[in-house]
């Protein structure tokens, strides 16, 4: 059995190696010729899987995408050809949630404006949006949710309209899929008009899809409204963001919010489990055995007295400033955007760090934030 996998998917050899011959490829440049004799195709969001890509293949047994979204997959085509498909919903939700939370802490530090006491609006309350909520509520932050589709589906949580969210929130974090049609389309959800409606000193964080914000309109807006602070992990026109936008963004990264080692491993592992179901074989490997130990497995904490201390603890796991600096230096280089994504292999989730409490202050709330082994 031939397994064709994106070269940037981790742990493919360890998980799938016993099932067949593995060939890794550049997912953004995948061709029908490469795919024609594959039995299994494993991709990420950079690969569009449709009739054009699969036209020469008549033996495909499974397509897996190590992503939450499926907008790059022609699901109707796969179904019409009886090709089993699985994505990995929620695989990197924790990573995205922690990334957005860390970005807010970094903004708070840079502009001397504490996150504590702000109201945060989450646009899109699915897996990733909910993961942000978990971090924020663990820290005692008030959160408002906007997600008309979930609201209409009967989700029991409280929701507000987008206009209400914009009016009442100090911070807005975007976590929607990209949809181009329909009553609740998200393509250019934040267009010129909506950007201009943002309250003074709003923070806007986008970790979902670049086209949710009209990037050209954002440049014009930021030229007039420097009070609004912006964090972009995703960009219109990836992998070639508008160079003129970058100077107006407070923190820039190359679509890596979900790129923790845990999130990547989780995505590959979900596909391993799904393929085992399709092949009707036992999935006997364990994800935990794949992950390396953190450089420091345990940090002793006397107290978390302020946000500066919390941010310092978070930086033990991930320092956003490093990726921001690297992005500004490399994104204009040949294939710089994709090069940074491919080599983003160092980030961990809070759970990788054990926190020991040596003081009298209660820091047990850190376990709700995701840190492991919080001890008295």
Curated annotation (Swiss-Prot):
Cited PANTHER family: D-ISOMER SPECIFIC 2-HYDROXYACID DEHYDROGENASE CATALYTIC DOMAIN-CONTAINING PROTEIN-RELATED, D-ISOMER SPECIFIC 2-HYDROXYACID DEHYDROGENASE FAMILY PROTEIN (AFU_ORTHOLOGUE AFUA_1G13630)
Its EC number(s): 1.1.1.290
The keyword NAD is assigned to this record: yes
Keyword Cytoplasm: yes
Keywords attached to this entry: Cytoplasm, NAD, Oxidoreductase, Pyridoxine biosynthesis
Superkingdom of the organism of origin: Bacteria
Binding site for NAD(+): 147, 233, 258
InterPro entries noted in UniProt: D-iso_2-hydroxyacid_DH_PdxB, D-isomer_2_OHA_DH_cat_dom, D-isomer_DH_CS, D-isomer_DH_NAD-bd, Erythronate-4-P_DHase, Erythronate-4-P_DHase_dimer, NAD(P)-bd_dom_sf, PdxB_dimer_sf
GO molecular function: 4-phosphoerythronate dehydrogenase activity; NAD binding; protein dimerization activity
PROSITE patterns named among the record's database cross-references: D_2_HYDROXYACID_DH_3 (PS00671)
Pathway: Cofactor biosynthesis; pyridoxine 5'-phosphate biosynthesis; pyridoxine 5'-phosphate from D-erythrose 4-phosphate: step 2/5
Annotated function: Catalyzes the oxidation of erythronate-4-phosphate to 3-hydroxy-2-oxo-4-phosphonooxybutanoate.
Principal EC category: oxidoreductase
One cellular component term from this protein's GO annotations in UniProt: cytoplasm
Complex formation: Homodimer.
Gene Ontology biological-process annotations: pyridoxine biosynthetic process
Annotated positions binding substrate: 45, 67, 259
Catalytic function, reaction form: 4-phospho-D-erythronate + NAD(+) = (R)-3-hydroxy-2-oxo-4-phosphooxybutanoate + NADH + H(+)
Source species: Shewanella halifaxensis (strain HAW-EB4)
Places the protein is found: Cytoplasm
Protein name as catalogued: Erythronate-4-phosphate dehydrogenase
Active site: residue positions: 209, 238, 255
Assigned protein family: Belongs to the D-isomer specific 2-hydroxyacid dehydrogenase family. PdxB subfamily.
């Amino acid at each position: 059995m031939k397994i064709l996998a994106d070269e940037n998917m981790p742990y493919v050899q360890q998980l799938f190696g016993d099932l067949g011959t593995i060939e890794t490829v550049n997912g953004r440049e995948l061709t029908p010729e490469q795919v024609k004799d594959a039995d299994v195709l494993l991709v990420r969001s950079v690969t569009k899987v449709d009739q054009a890509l699969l036209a020469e293949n008549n033996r495909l047994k499974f397509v897996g995408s190590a992503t939450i979204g499926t907008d790059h997959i022609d699901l109707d085509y796969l179904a019409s050809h009886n090709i089993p498909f699985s994505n990995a919903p929620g695989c990197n939700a924790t990573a995205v949630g922690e990334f957005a939370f860390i970005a807010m802490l970094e903004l708070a530090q840079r502009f001397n404006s504490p996150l504590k006491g702000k109201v945060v609006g989450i646009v899109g309350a699915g897996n990733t949006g909910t993961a942000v909520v978990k971090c924020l509520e663990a820290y005692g932050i008030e959160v408002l949710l906007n997600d008309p589709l979930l609201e209409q589906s009967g989700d029991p949580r409280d929701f507000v309209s987008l206009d209400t969210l914009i009016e009442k929130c100090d911070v807005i974090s975007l976590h929607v899929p990209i949809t181009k049609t329909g009553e609740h389309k998200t393509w250019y959800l934040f267009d010129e008009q909506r950007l201009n409606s943002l309250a003074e000193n709003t923070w806007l964080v986008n970790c979902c899809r670049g086209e949710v914000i009209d990037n050209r309109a954002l440049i014009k807006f930021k030229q007039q409204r420097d009070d609004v602070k912006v964090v972009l992990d995703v960009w219109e026109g990836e992998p070639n963001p508008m160079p003129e936008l970058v100077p107006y963004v407070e923190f820039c990264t190359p679509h890596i919010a979900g790129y923790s080692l845990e999130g990547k491993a989780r995505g590959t592992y979900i596909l391993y489990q799904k393929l085992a179901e399709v092949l009707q074989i036992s999935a006997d490997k364990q994800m935990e055995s794949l992950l390396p130990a953190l450089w420091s497995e345990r940090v002793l904490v006397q107290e978390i007295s302020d946000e500066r201390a919390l941010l310092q603890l978070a930086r033990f796991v991930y320092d956003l400033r490093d990726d921001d600096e690297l992005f500004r230096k490399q994104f204009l280089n040949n294939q710089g955007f994709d090069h940074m994504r491919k080599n983003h292999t160092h980030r961990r989730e809070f759970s990788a760090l054990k926190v020991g409490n040596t003081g009298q202050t209660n820091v047990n709330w850190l376990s709700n934030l995701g840190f492991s082994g919080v001890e008295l």
